[in-house]
Amino acid sequence: MNKNYDVISVGGGPAGIFAALELAGQNLSILLIEKGKDIDERRCPMREAGRLCASCSPCSITCGLGGAGAFSDGKLTLSSKVGGHLDEYLGEAETEALVKYVDGIYVKYGAPERVYGTGEKVDEIKYKASLNELRLIPVPIRHMGTENCCQVLTRMRDELKSHIDLKLETAVEEVLIGNGAAKGVRTKSGEEYGCYWLVSLSRHGKVWFMLVVWVLA
């Protein structure tokens, strides 16, 4: 075993980054593993050279620290009405509280203060829609922009570097199991890391991880 941790988090997208930020203040030893490149090293040959997709593995657009949305225009929809069904599990009030909490973290790391989709103009459009038997569901949006989105994620990464271990360009090949529980991971290069808690937050690896859960069940 190369090293033991309290927590190993697999996947360096938004979920992995936010999980690490939350746990970093809990006096735990944490390892975050991401198979893609660091956010400022992610390059796409197709975008930079104007050529056809080179089928890079892993793809630097969809993989890497910051996740698939790192190079998006950074729109944060601040409502439980869109983006999933979390409110069905937690209730609307708790979901809205979590949305507000996460939004506050984005602002802390540099997201702009301005929020679109609120105010008198929206109320006016909503009223006009009702006159035509239509229902407008206003959704507040914080627009970071592509460049600022990357900067926000970079600041989060820099914060994490002082609290946790980051292993980038490292693919997890196997979950180590003992006594019916996950005990750690083995990387594609053969390194083994033990842990008490294993968190998998990877979109790309969800099918693989579901198979692991099925084996444990």
Short names for language-model regions:
Residues 64-115:
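Dinucleotide-binding Rossmann-like beta1-alpha1 core, especially the glycine-rich loop
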